[in-house]
Amino acid sequence: MAGASELGTGPGAAGGDGDDSLYPIAVLIDELRNEDVQLRLNSIKKLSTIALALGVERTRSELLPFLTDTIYDEDEVLLALAEQLGNFTGLVGGPDFAHCLLPPLENLATVEETVVRDKAVESLRQISQEHTPVALEAYFVPLVKRLASGDWFTSRTSACGLFSVCYPRASNAVKAEIRQQFRSLCSDDTPMVRRAAASKLGEFAKVLELDSVKSEIVPLFTSLASDEQDSVRLLAVEACVSIAQLLSQDDLETLVMPTLRQAAEDKSWRVRYMVADRFSELQKAMGPKITLNDLIPAFQNLLKDCEAEVRAAAAHKVKELGENLPIEDRETIIMNQILPYIKELVSDTNQHVKSALASVIMGLSTILGKENTIEHLLPLFLAQLKDECPDVRLNIISNLDCVNEVIGIRQLSQSLLPAIVELAEDAKWRVRLAIIEYMPLLAGQLGVEFFDEKLNSLCMAWLVDHVYAIREAATNNLMKLVQKFGTEWAQNTIVPKVLVMANDPNYLHRMTTLFCINALSEACGQEITTKQMLPIVLKMAGDQVANVRFNVAKSLQKIGPILDTNALQGEVKPVLQKLGQDEDMDVKYFAQEAISVLALA
């Protein structure tokens, strides 16, 4: 092949004419061989530009062989190359020549770095669709066979991801060979290969004929689900969902359920975790009869598993389990078969388990209805609101809207208050931040009187929190509250308290007044802004701290559009002009920007 630098200098390189566009192509081609990895990477990312300039023939005859040999490069470069080649069919002459892209991608599918291999497989899957059935058997299937029988496990793992894309369009004889190769990879000596095969088992099952699913895929599933490596067994659980969707109820009971039962009681917690994590999908795939007879007992065991991770994963699925049950049986099954286990989990020793349950338990209220919620769930909610773990309390509060729809929030309000206050004052600022974000929702559900009496002071306290993110969130919170409760409420309750902070000795608190005014002005409208807020902002223009003064300029720019012309010309303009002459550069800059934006020059 021509040297990389020679590639760019022929007349075909940039479409002839020897114009300026030829130069960058020559540079890009040179960079493909540069010692600097960043330059090689840059060139690979522009590979389509090079190919376009070279034309389809030179791309096929020169560029692709060159790229096939660059296999010993940095992983980052190889990753970019694997990605580029997936979209290269048009640049080599269209689908008739798609097979030309296979050699470099085959090489990339065998490298050591997993990310590169995965990207090469992704591109090969893409290109397989562009092969005609004849080309698929002539070029693509042999590639899959070579990878599947490669000496290195890396090539065999890559092959696993390619069976499902070439199987549907292959002839019957070739299909039999493909199935045979997949079977052998499922019993490969190397666990990594069996893992790759297990991860693609469900996907492969979907493209097989039903008879082959029963006669070949199910035995493979059974074998992988009892593999000596738990990392293989847990992937077989994932495949179970896809396989179950393809079989009849009778077949499921005889062919799949014994293996799934075994997985739900596996000695490795990671396999049991996978059953819990995929429970909703398994439930849908298996259908109501098997769910009732087999899956519910398995779920009960997962809820009382000795491993906290498993209990947490199962707890997460409680609400979905209920929603997926037949409507006529939901209430009875949850009340009799699931609720006793939930009651135990409320006082679990592990906070992740309690937190997982708290994030979904409120959703059961819509399934169980008003009476059951008040009698059975309410005591659990109240216990969780008093839990020592902030995440548990937070998860209950953040899902209050579910309960509000069923029983109304008043039932909870007395227990809710201490929990909210504690979270609002929690030492961790992220916990405080989370509760602020739920405040507008809570306010809407609790009503204005309850809010003013119990929660208003908290909202004001957040405005002077020592963490900026909290002060900022508290400001946005006020705006949302005004949108919920109206301008009259703002005028009487919020605005006076905000304006008092303008005289606070701490300049950060004085600045918070300005941030609040920025947020509230739009929600409060012209009259309140002009009469109550503007005078305070103008007065603060004389503040001793430059940070406050330039924030005055920014505030005037923000509230300017809400004010009428008289206020702008008579009050705002003189103050901005004065700030525009300030000794501080930032104050001067923001004042002049405000004058310009408000067209007051």
From Swiss-Prot:
One Pfam entry for this protein is PPP2R1A-like_HEAT
Domain of life of the organism in this record? Eukaryota
Alphabetically list the UniProt keywords: Acetylation, Repeat
- UniProt xrefs under InterPro entries: ARM-like, ARM-type_fold, HEAT, HEAT_type_2, PP2A/SF3B1-like_HEAT, PP2A_Regulatory_Subunit_A
Per the record's keyword annotation, is Repeat included, yes or no?
A: yes
Choose one Gene Ontology CC annotation of this protein and give it.
Answer: extracellular exosome
- Is RNA-binding among this UniProt entry's keywords? no
Gene Ontology molecular function: protein phosphatase regulator activity
Q: Which family does it belong to?
A: Belongs to the phosphatase 2A regulatory subunit A family.
PANTHER family per the UniProt record, alphabetical: SERINE/THREONINE-PROTEIN PHOSPHATASE PP2A 65 KDA REGULATORY SUBUNIT, SERINE_THREONINE-PROTEIN PHOSPHATASE 2A 65 KDA REGULATORY SUBUNIT A BETA ISOFORM
This protein's domain notes: Each HEAT repeat appears to consist of two alpha helices joined by a hydrophilic region, the intrarepeat loop. The repeat units may be arranged laterally to form a rod-like structure.
Name of the featured protein: Serine/threonine-protein phosphatase 2A 65 kDa regulatory subunit A beta isoform
Q: What is the lineage of its organism?
A: Eukaryota, Metazoa, Chordata, Craniata, Vertebrata
